[in-house]
From Swiss-Prot:
PTM note: Three different forms of TVIIA exist. Pro-10 and Pro-11 of conotoxin TVIIA are hydroxylated in TVIIA, whereas Pro-10 is not hydroxylated in [Pro10]TVIIA and neither Pro-10 nor Pro-11 are hydroxylated in [Pro10,11]TVIIA.
Expression sites by tissue: Expressed by the venom duct.
Protein name: Conotoxin TVIIA
PTM-bearing positions, type 4-hydroxyproline: P10, P11
Organism field: Conus tulipa
């Protein structure tokens, strides 16, 4: 699942990324 997903983020954020403020960010904090 996508942690923090919102409508501004593409579905690819679900794959190893999460959504933060409309942008995809690494779940590892990079």
């Amino acid at each position: 699942s996508c942690s923090g997903r919102d409508s501004r983020c593409p579905p690819v954020c679900c794959m190893g990324l999460m959504c933060s403020r409309g942008k995809c960010v690494s779940i590892y904090g990079e």
